[in-house]
């Protein structure tokens, strides 16, 4: 719909000036919900009002008519805006904030009493551009990403930025790994070319990952335009100042910066130069595996019960975010992994230091996000105070290290704590300027210390002691005139005035007393001195707030000059938090330092699943540990055995141990020797409650296909019940072939759980495949799952025992036992004939009488009969009754 059509639709020509102003702004932001500031409220009109009233649960009213059409309206108080924004952002709406750029008085002075207050959009809030603490999760990043697919389509470029922390990164991603990389980052919003709207990629991003896509015209990503944006933003003359980057990376960075400029209205934070990373520096974990292993969220999308929630004992927000990033991006470089492990080991060996540091870290603030708010002019005095207190605490933390080690600290610890020395100049600046009781809102005043600026002190003196100055002036005028009854009073018409009785009028001789008003018994005067005092008193509040804002802006600009240092300090504190956290959980849960090799070792002794173990501990139960010994000669474990015996837990725990080890943490085991894993793949079905919705055979095959296509020799594959979604013969054939492919072609490490016992014969001709099963203890018809993985193959699945534990009716279990017995008496190759015989001999709706059930009923009946007491008639009736039972 073009502009003329829009104006016609909304009766623009007959609308009031204020409503025309609204429509002009709305027409320029049709893709947004427009919140229009009117006094103390943000109002919404027309369709926006109807939508917002439903989403926010607020009353829908009307604001008169526009022509014949009634104007729908709803609004929210300006001071509660963030509460309502939270709901809108959660629903993925794009919100434009339209503020008043002048006061009504200023508008009147500019254009008379009919002038409309000037308004404009000051910011557009989207899921990927939030910085408000109340609107974003404190313990995870909030990424905006731009994805650029070059014409060759072999490698895509991805730039992602967290506006709340000023982190900006660019990476080239193989086309086949785009979804996996997006799953790692979990961006809140993705910029994509309009040309890709109908592509399979866009469909997968939306349907599989459920991420918000914001489409932009193709020219938004144009190379020359994006290059100019980058050069202008970073004030560079040559794009090489960014580093060695491709054309598509330039487009990705430039489009992100342009989008930030459009949404923040030029008020973009001081972003550092983008960090260029190598995609292969991190372990690849596809989106399905992340979901199956519940790394940062559980199957419902919450953090509770996830690996992150189990490992996260950090004490700062920035530390929590860093741990989130570590878990999302395990390392693949042995040197870097060992560097982290050495840091963890240092703290594990110094638990007393850890205890002190963790207590001190609790006193620090999230200065990354404080700094962002400062650079975007959305901060308060409390942000500066947070920086001051953090600077102070940082120096104390450094003293803890030197008290214990002096100058003999390992180099890798020295490097971490170097920024903790503080910045005396910055600390003193804030300490000398910002009041300890500084309010959240600059408009409330009282943020600058009085002694910092004489004018601030003077204005606050007027505000606090105005009555005293009036009293002094009154005493002065009484002395000058000799009128002891002279008063200084106030009314809303003439303001402050000197009031004397009519009989004393002859005593007013000095011409400085200017007549204002005469009443029956009183005469009122003013003086230039009184008028000046009144003006100062009336304007003192406004003047001091204006002056404080000016001074505050200057202080903030000086803080921004220290941005690089503050980011290093934040990085140091978050790193300390994470590594102290690793030491803490290693001590608390008995974790061990893993050893890394450059071969295919995966030697875990007494490994445990950290999440399951913690859940069992809450119930005062013990976790049954297990070994896993994969190597070049024994790459594949084929695991058979009953359901509910712990197969899935065993599979997951080994994948999780690899992830934990490669983030630099100790692991839940007695010992661990691991050849670096470059990719982890996990195929686990819906029956294990780790995938939302109903799993299908096609979904299973698609995931298995992707695993076989993307795995390398250094990958770890976890497969659970491949082939179960189709017929037995098809399933066995597929599982067999998949195992052969992994063994002969991929030659990588694999844990393969199955209920197809036919596969166990493969160990006879696949030398790197070994059979393992779950230990079972049988006692009559009862079984006990021991949860131990042992060498060997299961001879049956014990499915009927699990069914009985699940509470299936006894008659169903008994009948199933009969049918199973017939199958077991017949060779596997004749299974089809068994079913045919059953269907031919028995009606579809008829079950052969259950002998076990009949026997139990007869036993029960006979137990109540005393033959010596039966009459002939009762005996005959009993015979008929028994006949009915059989």
UniProtKB/Swiss-Prot annotation:
Record's PROSITE patterns?
DNA_MISMATCH_REPAIR_2 (PS00486)
**What is an example of a GO molecular function annotated in this UniProt entry?**
mismatched DNA binding
Q: Record's Pfam families? A: MutS_I, MutS_II, MutS_III, MutS_IV, MutS_V
Q: Which residues form a coiled coil?
A: none
Cite the entry's keywords alphabetically: ATP-binding, DNA damage, DNA repair, DNA-binding, Nucleotide-binding
Which biological process annotations from GO are given for this protein? mismatch repair
Q: Which CDD domains match?
A: ABC_MutS1
Q: Which residues bind ATP?
A: 641-648
The keyword Amino-acid biosynthesis appears for this protein = no
Q: What does this protein do?
A: This protein is involved in the repair of mismatches in DNA. It is possible that it carries out the mismatch recognition step. This protein has a weak ATPase activity.
Could you say which protein family the record assigns here? Belongs to the DNA mismatch repair MutS family.
Identification of the protein by name: DNA mismatch repair protein MutS
Organism of origin: Rickettsia rickettsii (strain Sheila Smith)
Show the taxonomic lineage.
Bacteria, Pseudomonadati, Pseudomonadota, Alphaproteobacteria, Rickettsiales
Q: Quick one: which gene encodes this?
A: mutS
């Amino acid at each position: 719909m073009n502009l003329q059509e829009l104006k016609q639709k909304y009766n623009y020509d007959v609308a009031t000036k204020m409503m025309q102003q609204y429509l002009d702004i709305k027409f320029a932001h049709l893709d947004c919900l427009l919140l229009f500031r009117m006094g103390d409220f943000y109002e919404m009109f027309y369709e926006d009002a109807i939508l917002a009233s439903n989403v926010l649960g607020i009353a829908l009213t009307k604001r008169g008519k526009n022509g014949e059409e009634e104007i729908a309206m709803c609004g929210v108080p300006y001071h509660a805006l963030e509460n309502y924004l939270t709901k809108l952002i959660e629903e993925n709406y794009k919100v434009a904030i339209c503020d008043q750029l002048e006061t009504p008085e200023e508008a009147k002075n500019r254009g008379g009493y009919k002038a409309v207050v000037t308004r404009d959009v000051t910011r557009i809030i989207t899921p990927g551009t939030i910085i408000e603490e109340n609107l974003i999760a404190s313990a995870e990043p909030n990424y905006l990403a731009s994805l650029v697919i070059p014409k060759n389509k072999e490698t895509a470029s991805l730039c992602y930025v967290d506006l709340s922390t000023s982190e900006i990164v660019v990476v080239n991603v193989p086309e086949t790994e785009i979804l996996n990389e997006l799953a790692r980052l979990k961006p809140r919003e993705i910029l994509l070319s309009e040309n890709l709207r109908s592509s399979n990629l866009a469909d997968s991003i939306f349907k599989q990952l459920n991420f918000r896509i914001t489409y932009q015209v193709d020219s938004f990503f144009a190379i020359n335009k994006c290059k100019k944006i980058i050069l202008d933003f970073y004030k560079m003359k040559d794009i090489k100042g960014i580093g060695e980057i491709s054309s598509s990376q330039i487009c990705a960075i430039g489009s992100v910066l342009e989008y930030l400029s459009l949404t923040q209205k030029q008020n973009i934070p001081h972003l550092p130069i983008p960090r260029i990373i190598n995609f292969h520096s991190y372990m690849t974990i596809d989106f399905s595996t992340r979901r199956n292993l519940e790394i940062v969220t559980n199957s419902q999308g919450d953090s509770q019960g996830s690996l992150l929630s189990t490992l996260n004992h950090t004490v700062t927000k920035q530390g929590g975010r860093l741990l989130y990033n570590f878990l999302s991006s395990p390392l693949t470089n042995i040197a870097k992994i060992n560097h982290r492990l050495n840091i963890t080991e240092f703290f594990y060996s110094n638990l007393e230091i850890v205890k002190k540091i963790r207590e001190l870290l609790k006193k620090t603030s999230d200065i990354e996000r404080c700094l962002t708010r400062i650079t975007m002019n959305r901060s308060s005095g409390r942000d500066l105070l947070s920086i001051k207190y953090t600077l102070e605490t940082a120096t104390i933390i450094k003293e803890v290290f030197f008290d214990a080690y002096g100058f003999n600290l390992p180099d890798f610890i020295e490097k971490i704590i170097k920024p903790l020395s503080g910045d005396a100049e910055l600390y003193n600046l804030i300490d000398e300027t910002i009041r300890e009781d500084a309010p959240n809102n600059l408009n409330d005043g009282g943020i600058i210390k009085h002694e910092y600026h004489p004018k601030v002190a003077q204005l606050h003196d007027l505000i606090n002691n105005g009555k005293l100055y009036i009293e002094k002036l009154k005493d002065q005028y009484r002395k000058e005139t000799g009128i002891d009854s002279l008063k200084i009073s106030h009314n809303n018409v003439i303001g402050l005035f000197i009031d004397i009785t009519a009989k004393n009028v002859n005593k007013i001789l000095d011409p400085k007393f200017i007549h204002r008003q005469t009443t029956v018994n009183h005469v009122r005067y003013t003086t230039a001195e009184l008028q000046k005092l009144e003006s100062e008193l009336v304007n003192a509040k406004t003047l001091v707030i204006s002056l404080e804002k000016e001074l505050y802006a200057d202080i903030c600009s000086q803080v921004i000059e220290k941005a690089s240092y503050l980011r290093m300090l934040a990085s140091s504190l978050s790193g300390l938090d994470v590594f102290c956290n690793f030491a803490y959980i290693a001590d608390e849960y008995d974790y061990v330092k893993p050893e890394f090799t450059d071969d295919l070792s995966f030697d875990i002794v007494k490994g445990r699943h950290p999440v399951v173990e913690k859940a069992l501990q809450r119930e005062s139960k013990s976790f049954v540990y297990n070994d896993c010994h994969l190597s070049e000669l024994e790459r594949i474990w084929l695991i058979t055995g009953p359901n509910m015996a712990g197969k899935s837990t065993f599979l997951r725990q080994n994948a999780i141990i690899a992830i934990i080890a490669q983030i630099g943490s100790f692991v839940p085991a007695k010992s661990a020797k691991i050849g670096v894993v470059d990719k982890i793949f996990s195929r686990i079905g819906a029956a294990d409650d780790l995938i939302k919705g109903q799993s299908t055979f096609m979904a299973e095959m698609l995931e298995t296909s992707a695993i076989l296509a993307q795995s390398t020799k250094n990958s770890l594959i976890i497969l659970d019940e491949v082939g179960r979604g189709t017929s037995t013969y098809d399933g066995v054939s597929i599982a067999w072939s998949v195992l052969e492919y992994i063994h002969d072609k991929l030659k990588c490490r694999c844990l393969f759980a199955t209920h197809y016992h036919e596969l166990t014969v493969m160990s006879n001709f696949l030398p790197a495949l070994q059979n393992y099963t779950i230990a079972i203890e049988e006692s009559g018809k009862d079984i006990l799952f021991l949860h131990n993985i042992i060498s060997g193959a299961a001879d049956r699945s014990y499915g009927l025992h699990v069914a009985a534990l699940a509470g299936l009716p006894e008659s169903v279990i008994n009948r199933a036992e009969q049918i199973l017995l017939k199958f077991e008496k017949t060779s596997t190759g004749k299974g089809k004939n068994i079913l045919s015989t059953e269907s031919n001999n028995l009606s579809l709706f008829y079950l052969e009488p259950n002998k076990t059930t009949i026997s139990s009923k007869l036993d029960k009946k006979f137990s109540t009969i005393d033959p010596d007491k039966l009459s002939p008639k009762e005996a005959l009736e009993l015979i008929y009754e028994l006949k009915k039972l059989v």
